[in-house]
Structure formats: structure tokens, C-alpha cells
Amino acid sequence: MAAETFLFTSESVNEGHPDKLCDQVSDAVLDACLAQDPDSKVACETCTKTNMVMVFGEITTKATVDYEKIVRDTCRGIGFVSDDVGLDADRCKVLVNIEQQSPDIAQGVHGHFTKRPEEIGAGDQGHMFGYATDETPELMPLSHVLATKLGARLTEVRKNGTCAWLRPDGKTQVTVEYLNDAGAMVPVRVHTVLISTQHDETVTNDEIAADLKEHVIKPVIPDKYLDEKTIFHLNPSGRFVIGGPHGDAGLTGRKIIIDTYGGWGAHGGGAFSGKDPTKVDRSGAYIARQAAKSIVASGLARRCIVQVSYAIGVPEPLSVFVDSYGTGKIPDKEILKIVKENFDFRPGMMTINLDLKRGGNRFIKTAAYGHFGREDPDFTWEVVKPLKYEKASS
């Protein structure tokens, strides 16, 4: 009898999607603040609609930041250069409403900068998750990896002119058929590929489908996962000319599953973009990913999830949880002990160990195409940490 398989789907959106535009603006602001003042406290939100981008939130920094320039440069870099593609970076209205961080929060979290790193408290309460699986070289879920890479490839062929008819906005979705191998996930085949991409007026649906198959799907999805039964939905709505902020409103922090594991694992609900590393929504999720990835990379489990939780103003985590989904080579309680001994979950120490105070052109890179599974030295939380522990004598 054939083994039971199941279908699992993950989606992604391009850098030109309105919500992702907002994530990138928020992280561009964070980068600019950290580049001049590594101790900047940043909680920057962005929203957008037709012909308008607004940045708002709480920022305490010694940096001199030209918010309007950051907004326009970010929009232009994505490709929003005229109204007909969804936004004109040079002519749109830019609104700024930034205040300082509440002094109540400041004294509770970092004692107005008087605390040592190990004493710095969490910027808020919350719980975060990290996940890893041995089904791909990135130790990420295949459905998420493929959906994300299709979106990145759409942008690549738009910007290099291979598919000149493409416009910045777009969405992808991949359904993978999986086998459950005693708790580990084994991809069998790609069941369905869905791409909806913004395009100009001149291109036909047949041209869109042919170009997407040849220049986007073929280079991204390995042949071994495609067969004659694979279903393709390529711009199934038939027309997608109006896009970007003209088509939909956008807001920071509305694509948190795309940012993480594509629906696998779990999510504590906190978004990442526009937040400095004292915000454990971000730093806690990053260290939890490094812990889960290191467990899988070390061979202690084929699949692993790590949860960590915090109270505002308290440095030590309230709880740390590990589940290997039955794939552990040793009991989960022993894996948990190894995680606690090898990773420092205090916010001030996570910031140092992952070098999270460094801005520049760093966090904006995380704000499109996922925060995890990326090969880039700036993604320090993706570095597998060699685990020190007592190996049981056989």
C-alpha cells in the first residue's frame, strides 16, 4: 500500500506588494538610525495608499534622519517610478509622524541606557518561535522556499529586463505533496504553482504564461519536483495592471507568515520590520531560529521548533520550549537542556551575539523574501552554532 501523503501550501509576495513596501520602508528607517546611533530605539510603522506613504511611530535616536528621503529612495528602489505602476516615488505625498519612545518604557527596559547588556530587559511581553527542518539545504520548509524564490525571481527578471512587461506587485503560492516520515517532512512533488503578477497593458495572457514558465518557474523549481500532473495557475484572474499602493492599501507587519516559515512551525504574532533589537518580537524570533537550525544541523533532530517567552523589563526569558516532532536522536528534555546551555536568550546578549545593532543596508534586506533561510553574512542568526554538550557514552 502506498504511504499516506498530504498537501501543504505556502505563499509569498513581491517587494512591490503594498504591505512589503511598508516593511521595507520601516526597516530602511531602522537601518538609517542604527548606522549613526547603534543604541537607537526604533518602533517605526508605515502605511500606504494611492499617491501617499506615511511613516509613524516612536523613535529615540541621536541620528539625523531624513525620513522623506528614505521613503522616496526605498519606493524608487523597488520600481515605483510612475503612477501607472502604482506609485510615483518622486511625486507621492510623504507624511511623517514620529515621536520619542515613552520614558516609562525606556526606564523599564534599559534604565535610560544605564544598564549593562545582561541587565537589559525585554522591550515587551510576548512569545516567539524558531523552526527548522531537514527537507532543504536551507533547513527550511520546501513549500515556503519555493514560493519565496519564485517571488524573488519575478523581481529579478523585471529588473534585468528579461520580462520587461512585469510591474513591481505580485504574489506566488506553492502547494507541495509531502510524506510524513516518523515526524520528519519529506517532499514528494510540487502539486500546484500559482503566480499572480502585475503587468503592463501590452502583454497577452499567453505571453505571460509562457514567460513565467520559462523564465521564473524553470530556474526556481527543480525538475525532480515537477511532473505532468503539476497544476499551474498563472495570472488566473486574467488581468492585473493596477497594483502597488494604487491597487491596495499597505501596512507594516501584515506578512508575518511570509517573513517566517510559510505556515509551518508556529508564530507568536509579533512582526519584525521597523523594530530595533530590544524588541524581542524580532530578536527573540531570530535567536529561536538559530537554536532550532543548530539542533537540526547538528543531527540531534530532523525537525525542530523552539519557543521563547518574555515579560517587559525582565532580562531572563520566562520559558523556553523545544519539540522535535518525534525526530530527536535524544529526548526533547535533553535537547532543551542543550539549547539553554548554548544560547543566551537575554535581549542584551542576543543583540551582542547576533550583532543586531549594526544598520546600514542590513535590515531592509530582511524585509522582502523572508528573514530565514538566506545565505547572506548579514543574516547572523542563520549561522549554525556548534553545540557543546556531553554526548552519552554508547
UniProtKB/Swiss-Prot annotation:
Its cofactor is Mn(2+); Mg(2+); Co(2+); K(+). GO terms for molecular function: ATP binding; metal ion binding; methionine adenosyltransferase activity. One of its GO terms (biological process) is one-carbon metabolic process. Pfam families: S-AdoMet_synt_C (PF02773), S-AdoMet_synt_M (PF02772), S-AdoMet_synt_N (PF00438). ATP binds at residues 17, 169-171, 237-240, 248, 254-255, 271, 275, 279. Mg(2+) binds at residue 11. SUPFAM superfamilies: S-adenosylmethionine synthetase. Keywords: ATP-binding, Cobalt, Cytoplasm, Magnesium, Metal-binding, Nucleotide-binding, One-carbon metabolism, Potassium, Transferase. K(+) binds at residue 45. InterPro entries: ADOMET_SYNTHASE_CS, S-AdoMet_synt_C, S-AdoMet_synt_central, S-AdoMet_synt_N, S-AdoMet_synthetase, S-AdoMet_synthetase_sfam. Its EC number is 2.5.1.6. One of its GO terms (cellular component) is cytosol. Pathway: Amino-acid biosynthesis; S-adenosyl-L-methionine biosynthesis; S-adenosyl-L-methionine from L-methionine: step 1/1. Binds 2 divalent ions per subunit. The metal ions interact primarily with the substrate. Can utilize magnesium, manganese or cobalt (in vitro). Binds 1 potassium ion per subunit. The potassium ion interacts primarily with the substrate. It catalyses: L-methionine + ATP + H2O = S-adenosyl-L-methionine + phosphate + diphosphate. It is found in: Cytoplasm. L-methionine binds at residues 58, 101, 248, 279. NCBIfam families: metK (TIGR01034). Homotetramer. Belongs to the AdoMet synthase family. Catalyzes the formation of S-adenosylmethionine from methionine and ATP. The reaction comprises two steps that are both catalyzed by the same enzyme: formation of S-adenosylmethionine (AdoMet) and triphosphate, and subsequent hydrolysis of the triphosphate. This is S-adenosylmethionine synthase 2. It comes from Oryza sativa subsp. japonica. The gene is SAM2.
